[in-house]
Amino acid sequence: MPKLCVTLALTLGVIGSCSLRAIPILQADIDSLDARAQPYFDEASRNVPAVVDQLTEIGASCRLCGLMVRDKLAGTHETQDYLSSALKEPIIVPCRKGAEVYGCDFESDGFLNILAEVNADYAAIKGYALGGLAIEAIFIRQTVAALTSTLGSVVARLTATFGSGTASAVADGPLPVGDIIAIVMAAGGTAWSGYDLWKARKQLPAELTALLLSVIRDCQDACRREVLK
């Protein structure tokens, strides 16, 4: 019996020792993944100002309004497509590369659920998925939300003032930027007030910058949680 007790004690001691050693090894692995992935997420963050400048330039803002009006009237998703083309190479691709370092499967329901745990606002991202990719979905969904928050009153007034015919003319293209601006501004004070223009040129850049940087951080956080689950 004493011999059995000694053997059991030694066994438990070995198990305990292994368990204690596993914690720093796991943390070291995470640190290594972080070091390899961080440059990609940093690249995405550095590209945010240029993307925001592109999306909030007056011509782009008018075109986005036209696309949002058409989507509202026709049930299309052209705003998402437009934003995807603007966000993909400078922001989405680096984030996808960073996620790949962690070995994340961003098409899985598990990763979508983790994103929702990181930020409850991501719970509805499946409806915005392009090709089923969650990383694309969170950027598109959040950017659309920011645009709707800032430009929603413009879109509502354009929808009521012009109707589907002008919405299609604005969105179909190809139209020169000057023509797009002329169509949108044609509604005068009814469709685009001075306050609306101020929001588009002043409020939207700051809001969009903060949002995109937040999504980049949340994306990396979700990747780390995926590894640790």
Where are the regions that the model predicts?
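Terminal export/targeting leaders at protein ends
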Residues: M1-I125
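Membrane-engaging insertion elements
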Residues: L26-F41, S45-Q54, E78, L83, ...
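Cleavable Sec-type N-terminal signal peptides
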Residues: P2-C18, I140-L147, V154, L158, ...
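Hydrophobic membrane-targeting alpha-helices
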Residues: G13-R21, T166, V170, S193
